[in-house]
Curated annotation (Swiss-Prot):
Ca(2+) 1 binds at E17. Disulfide bonds join C23-C29. The modification Hydroxyproline is found at P9. It comes from Bison priscus. The carboxylated form is one of the main organic components of the bone matrix, which constitutes 1-2% of the total bone protein: it acts as a negative regulator of bone formation and is required to limit bone formation without impairing bone resorption or mineralization. The carboxylated form binds strongly to apatite and calcium. The uncarboxylated form acts as a hormone secreted by osteoblasts, which regulates different cellular processes, such as energy metabolism, male fertility and brain development. Regulates of energy metabolism by acting as a hormone favoring pancreatic beta-cell proliferation, insulin secretion and sensitivity and energy expenditure. Keywords: Biomineralization, Calcium, Disulfide bond, Extinct organism protein, Gamma-carboxyglutamic acid, Hormone, Hydroxylation, Metal-binding, Secreted. Belongs to the osteocalcin/matrix Gla protein family. This is Osteocalcin. One of its GO terms (molecular function) is hydroxyapatite binding.
Amino acid sequence: YLDHGLGAPAPYPDPLEPKREVCELNPDCDELADHIGFQEAYRRFYGPV
């Protein structure tokens, strides 16, 4: 393993990240996600994840 000064390797991209951002931009979805989790909140507002 060689360290080229780039820091830690990038984590795998989250395939749900775009949907997570949509939910976070909706105050109601964001609030519900705090209580029941993002995937369930997204499903209630927008349909299947």
